[in-house]
Amino acid sequence: MVHGYKGVQFQNWAKTYGCSPEMYYQPTSVGEVREVLALARQQNKKVKVVGGGHSPSDIACTDGFMIHMGKMNRVLQVDKEKKQVTVEAGILLTDLHPQLDKHGLALSNLGAVSDVTVGGVIGSGTHNTGIKHGILATQVVALTLMKADGTVLECSESSNADVFQAARVHLGCLGVILTVTLQCVPQFHLLETSFPSTLKEVLDNLDSHLKKSEYFRFLWFPHSENVSIIYQDHTNKEPSSASNWFWDYAIGFYLLEFLLWTSTYLPRLVGWINRFFFWLLFNCKKESSNLSHKIFSYECRFKQHVQDWAIPREKTKEALLELKAMLEAHPKVVAHYPVEVRFTRGDDILLSPCFQRDSCYMNIIMYRPYGKDVPRLDYWLAYETIMKKFGGRPHWAKAHNCTRKDFEKMYPAFHKFCDIREKLDPTGMFLNSYLEKVFY
């Protein structure tokens, strides 16, 4: 008999969203997941599955039953010939990497945070950068999913293909993802090179940068022309690191947090802070090399609010210059650094922000120094307006103000996804307030 807990308070990593589920379950087997869903049907309860809790939105929140998949975290099979690995959906990427290392395998692309579950990564459309690479879910070759009625579907391109096309970005609303099979590549090392540039230079030579580096991204420092360009590419170099406690923590975290807190009383400081920290930390070339997963992952030190929309790649320059012009025209609107700009190959996953188009993701951020919220509404709304103007689609895990009407315009396959969702979960067991805004 599956055991549930009362009185559990759930908070996401950034402590920006939370909820009090009526019951909190940590199943250890498929049978126990089935028991939870049977109880939910009997008592007419909503169910949400939660992974690492990193989503900066209320996508995982519920006052019904919450299922934490952390105890279903095994590697089930490694197929060395096909270079594929099958895992339980609750495994954290941080725990998967050393297992893949043992077999000389790696994932070809990863997001910045690995303290997340495989089921959650695909559910929210997690991405990184590189025009040869899709969002992380494009590495999924098969999955199993338990429907609201307790039956299990095996999904791949050759079995339940429609559900597979939807479930690779499932939003937690199709069922409980039980297992995922990932396509891997041989283990590889990456060399990361970062160097200073200007916004004009990077936008004028965007195609050249995209061709030069397999995993290219750049950071723009609002209220300035400053840019840090980051290349990541395959290497045979020995592992080396450019990290340094004094610069990374004493300056890059403790001093920055204090100055950002000060700027909540003196907002005009923000532009100066952005320029000062570019000069301190990003004004020279740096190199580091290591196993791919150690280079892809970096430590998020700050609690934060973020938005991250995907626009057609060819609109990058126009959209970024419009964001810059908006900030120049409204000096009272302040923006923390960086605006992170990444690039992703198009795909055929129904609710992927990169559905049928190569995309540019433009991530904006406002930190919460010492847990204090900084006024961001004007910046947020102006950014959303610009993103919508250029055909943007918001990252599913991150907060946004879009509703069904918006998604119907953004996603050619939106109605197809809705039909699949209604077939798999006719009573709406897996919905919550976030998803009701999406679908109703």
From Swiss-Prot:
Its EC number is 1.1.3.8. Pathway: Cofactor biosynthesis; L-ascorbate biosynthesis via UDP-alpha-D-glucuronate pathway; L-ascorbate from UDP-alpha-D-glucuronate: step 4/4. The chain crosses the membrane at residues 251-273. It catalyses: L-gulono-1,4-lactone + O2 = L-ascorbate + H2O2 + H(+). It holds the Pfam family ALO. Highly expressed in liver. It is a single-pass membrane protein. InterPro entries: ALO_C, FAD-bd_PCMH, FAD-bd_PCMH-like_sf, FAD-bd_PCMH_sub1, FAD-bd_PCMH_sub2, FAD_lactone_oxidase-like, Oxid_FAD_bind_N, Oxy_OxRdtase_FAD_BS. GO terms for molecular function: D-arabinono-1,4-lactone oxidase activity; FAD binding; flavin adenine dinucleotide binding; L-gulonolactone oxidase activity. The modification Pros-8alpha-FAD histidine is found at H54. Keywords: Ascorbate biosynthesis, Endoplasmic reticulum, FAD, Flavoprotein, Membrane, Microsome, Oxidoreductase, Transmembrane, Transmembrane helix. PROSITE patterns: FAD_PCMH (PS51387), OX2_COVAL_FAD (PS00862). One of its GO terms (cellular component) is endoplasmic reticulum membrane. Its cofactor is FAD. The keyword Ribonucleoprotein does not apply. PANTHER family: L-GULONOLACTONE OXIDASE. Oxidizes L-gulono-1,4-lactone to hydrogen peroxide and L-xylo-hexulonolactone which spontaneously isomerizes to L-ascorbate. This is L-gulonolactone oxidase. It comes from Mus musculus.
